[in-house]
Regions:
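Single conserved hydrophobic/aromatic residue that forms the stacking wall/gate
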Residues: 1-11
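Carbohydrate-interacting/catalytic domains
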Residues: 5, 35-41, 51-56, 60-181
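Active-site clefts of carbohydrate-active enzymes
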Residues: 14-35
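Conserved glycine-rich, hydrophobic/aromatic-active-site segments
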Residues: 44
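Proline-centered turn/helix-capping motifs that create local helix->coil transitions or kinks
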Residues: 13-14, 103
Length: 181
């Protein structure tokens, strides 16, 4: 609730072009902070789904770890070559979805469902609506809400989504549902 209210205020006052990140060269890397590594892809889904321009600090797309208290060398690793993995693939899909979505780039923000382990929020522009859905639990979750339409397409996977009977989110999952017109 505070995030929605605070974000809404900043969003209206400052515009839609602020930079967002989950870690950088001055803080402990997010992969070192999270106690459950299944949450790592989800935090990036949140970053790419929220208003703003997501910035991925180099190495973080591979799940690089590093702690601020261990000094700069821990945070600013050098790499001989890319360490492409499933997280890299996931972030690439999120970036592609964001790149091609008017709502994710310029749309407003509205919270739809919020629990301790799940959130669904709407990004709406003049021509597009996208629901960003995240389940951070180790259990499946079925969300019941009025989507305002019957079907959508997941911008991450390309799969169709039917809102009839509730929307099931598998454990540790995220979706960007582009709503039908």
């Amino acid at each position: 609730c505070l995030l929605s209210r605070g974000l809404g205020d900043v969003y209206k006052r400052q515009g839609k072009h602020f930079l967002s990140f989950v870690d950088n060269h001055d803080v402990t890397r997010v992969a070192s902070i999270l106690t459950n590594k299944n949450h790592l892809p989800l935090i990036y889904a949140l970053a790419f789904g929220m208003p703003g321009i997501p910035c991925v600090y180099y190495g973080s797309e591979w799940g690089a770890e590093g702690r601020k208290e261990e000094g700069d060398p821990s945070l600013r690793l050098s790499y001989e070559k890319p360490e492409w993995n499933e997280l890299t693939d996931w972030i690439s899909k999120l970036a592609e979805a964001k790149k091609h979505s008017e709502a994710l780039n310029y749309g407003g923000f509205r919270s739809v469902v919020l629990t301790n382990h799940q959130c669904i929020f709407e990004r709406r522009s003049e021509h597009e609506r996208v629901l960003v859905a995240i389940n951070a639990s180790d259990q499946p979750y079925t969300a019941h809400f009025d989507a305002g339409c019957g079907t959508a397409q997941d911008l991450i996977t390309g799969q169709p989504h039917d809102f009839g009977g509730g929307s099931e989110l598998p454990p540790y999952s995220a979706a960007f549902w582009k709503m039908e017109h």
